[in-house]
């Protein structure tokens, strides 16, 4: 029989057990002639076999000790032997070394032997065992085979050879196919890749997933809003609401459905407050669907999901509201209308106090120049906040938030490399939003007590209950 090998590096010196063994001569000899193993030959990358393409190394012409070698790159050949050019161009320089470990003992592999990458020592050990049909004393200790102790337990060493896939039937002639060589190099590069690179890839994947969920679940985003506010939209510009007359016109067209069922007969402030609630309810629904797309959220206890949304939705709403605001006003009715800041300030108390704090926050928030990918992670971090009152699985939720905040930090470093203070500024905005929501909830309670016509939507009433 003949062993076929594909050297990866220069052959290592013979082991002590090979030199001292009466089988050392066999270590250098072939295990039969070529014809005896013709049935075991695997096809090379070209799918055909030609003896003239391979190099024979032995003690001389006619020697029984010829060794057929499968190289990763062209090996020096005797002048009497010629080799046709490999299909597809010349082989790579011999200096290219694939630093692969022996699958049996972990030493440096010298080539592809008997179906696996193995060192010279383990290759020779397996060859002798197979050829001479050696039987070793059984060992039940499952010895760990390493370079330093591989000669101690022959039974376990042979068992390891078999377990990793060494087989006499895996003998192969010729050079390693280019496709297999390329695959090996790719595997090596993957194994040698910095663990931090793999972690970064996972974090980028998480950021992408959250961003895509954000774009999918929200009707309005910053990109759309900025196009409209800049007057670059392809359709008609938004209808501007700047006084009572234009408000009435908008109510007959843009928000006709919202002011039906008797609402149209109430005063302007109550009608505006009602429309604001309708928009908030719709956004809460969108936020709920978005939250389900955050990895791990849907697996939380249902009570924890409700608690996170109860305390997080308004912070998220006011963060996203900044996208549709500028210093002069804000988009309404899906971007089809624009209500001026001055008109909202002209409403009677306490309604005139509802939106002005949101404009103040929005101007500072917009100054950070975040895009939708940044905002999506920011909103996800707001929702998955582990310090909300009444949570059951605090530790798990805190871990979720830590992961999202870490992704947010890395994303900001990539997306805004010149703004090193953006991340801490954004964390401060989380605290600012809590204060903003607290003040808003208090104002809503005042309206609830003093304005009999300004009824609260049941869903929002449940959110406000026991909030602060």
UniProtKB/Swiss-Prot annotation:
Record's GO cellular component terms = nucleus
Q: How is it modified after translation?
A: Ubiquitinated by E3 ubiquitin-protein ligase HUWE1; leading to proteasomal degradation. Phosphorylated.
Instruction: Give the CDD domains listed for this entry.
Output: NR_DBD_Ppar (cd06965), NR_LBD_PPAR (cd06932)
Superkingdom: Eukaryota
Q: Which InterPro entries match?
A: 1Cnucl_rcpt (IPR003074), NHR-like_dom_sf (IPR035500), Nucl_hrmn_rcpt_lig-bd (IPR000536), Nuclear_hormone_rcpt_NR1 (IPR050234), Nuclear_hrmn_rcpt (IPR001723), PPAR-alpha (IPR003076), Znf_hrmn_rcpt (IPR001628), Znf_NHR/GATA (IPR013088)
Q: Where is the NR LBD domain?
A: 239-466
One GO molecular function term? lipid binding
- Name the SMART domains on file: HOLI, ZnF_C4
Here the segments flagged for biased composition (Polar residues) are 66-82
Q: Which Pfam families match?
A: Hormone_recep, zf-C4
Q: Which residues of this protein are annotated with the site description Essential for heterodimerization with RXRA?
A: 433
Task: Tell me which UniProt keywords the record has, alphabetically.
Answer: Activator, Biological rhythms, DNA-binding, Lipid-binding, Metal-binding, Nucleus, Receptor, Transcription, Transcription regulation, Ubl conjugation, Zinc, Zinc-finger
Tell where it localizes.
Nucleus
- The NR C4-type zinc finger ranges are 102-122, 139-161
Required for heterodimerization with RXRA, as annotated region: 304-433
| One Gene Ontology biological process | regulation of circadian rhythm
The entry's function note states: Ligand-activated transcription factor. Key regulator of lipid metabolism. Activated by the endogenous ligand 1-palmitoyl-2-oleoyl-sn-glycerol-3-phosphocholine (16:0/18:1-GPC). Activated by oleylethanolamide, a naturally occurring lipid that regulates satiety. Receptor for peroxisome proliferators such as hypolipidemic drugs and fatty acids. Regulates the peroxisomal beta-oxidation pathway of fatty acids. Functions as a transcription activator for the ACOX1 and P450 genes. Transactivation activity requires heterodimerization with RXRA and is antagonized by NR2C2.
How the protein assembles, per its UniProt entry? Answer: Heterodimer; with RXRA. This heterodimerization is required for DNA binding and transactivation activity. Interacts with NCOA3 coactivator. Interacts with CITED2; the interaction stimulates its transcriptional activity. Also interacts with PPARBP in vitro. Interacts with AKAP13, LPIN1, PRDM16 and coactivator NCOA6. Interacts with ASXL1 and ASXL2. Interacts with PER2. Interacts with SIRT1; the interaction seems to be modulated by NAD(+) levels. Interacts with CRY1 and CRY2.
What family is reported? Answer: Belongs to the nuclear hormone receptor family. NR1 subfamily.
Listed name of the protein: Peroxisome proliferator-activated receptor alpha
């Amino acid at each position: 029989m003949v062993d076929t090998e594909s050297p990866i590096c220069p052959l290592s010196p013979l082991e002590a057990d090979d030199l001292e063994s009466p089988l050392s001569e066999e270590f250098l000899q072939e295990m039969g002639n070529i014809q005896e193993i013709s049935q075991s030959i695997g096809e090379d990358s070209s799918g055909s076999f030609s003896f003239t393409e391979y190099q024979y190394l032995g003690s001389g012409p006619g020697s029984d000790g010829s060794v057929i070698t499968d190289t990763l790159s062209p090996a020096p050949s005797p002048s009497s032997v010629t080799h046709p050019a490999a299909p597809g161009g010349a082989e790579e320089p011999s200096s290219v070394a694939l630093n692969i470990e022996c699958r049996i003992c972990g030493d440096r592999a010298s080539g592809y032997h008997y179906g696996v990458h193995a060192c010279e020592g383990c290759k020779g050990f397996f060859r002798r065992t197979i050829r001479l049909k050696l039987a070793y004393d059984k060992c039940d200790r499952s010895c760990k085979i390493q370079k330093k102790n591989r000669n101690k337990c022959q039974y376990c060493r042979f068992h390891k050879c078999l377990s990793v896939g060494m087989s006499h039937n895996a003998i192969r002639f010729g050079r390693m196919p280019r496709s297999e060589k390329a695959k090996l190099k790719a595997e090596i590069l993957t194994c040698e890749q910095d663990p931090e690179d793999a972690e970064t890839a996972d974090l980028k994947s998480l950021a992408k997933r959250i961003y895509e969920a954000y774009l999918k679940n929200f009707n309005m985003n910053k990109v759309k809003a900025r196009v409209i506010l800049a007057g670059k939209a392809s359709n008609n510009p938004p209808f501007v609401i700047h006084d009572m007359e234009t408000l009435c016109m908008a109510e007959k067209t843009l928000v006709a459905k919202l002011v039906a069922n008797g609402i149209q007969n109430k005063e302007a402030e109550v009608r505006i407050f009602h429309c604001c609630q309708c928009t908030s309810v719709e956004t809460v629904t969108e936020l709920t669907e978005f939250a389900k797309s955050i990895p791990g959220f849907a697996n939380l206890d249902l009570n924890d999901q409700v608690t996170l949304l109860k305390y997080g939705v308004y912070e998220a709403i006011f963060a996203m509201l900044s996208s549709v605001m500028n210093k002069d006003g804000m988009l309404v009715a899906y971007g089809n209308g624009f209500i001026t800041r001055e008109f909202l300030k002209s409403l009677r108390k306490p309604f005139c106090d509802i939106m002005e704090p949101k404009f103040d926050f929005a101007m500072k928030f917009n100054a950070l120049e975040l895009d939708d990918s940044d905002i999506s992670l920011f909103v996800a971090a707001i929702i998955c906040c582990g310090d909300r009152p009444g949570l059951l699985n605090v530790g798990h939720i805190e871990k979720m938030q830590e992961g999202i905040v870490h992704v947010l930090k890395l994303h900001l470093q990539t997306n805004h490399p010149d703004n090193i203070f953006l991340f801490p500024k954004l964390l401060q905005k989380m605290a600012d939003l809590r204060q903003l929501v607290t003040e808003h909830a208090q104002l809503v309670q005042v309206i609830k007590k003093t304005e009999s016509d300004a009824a609260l939507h049941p869903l929002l009433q449940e959110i406000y209950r026991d909030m602060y």
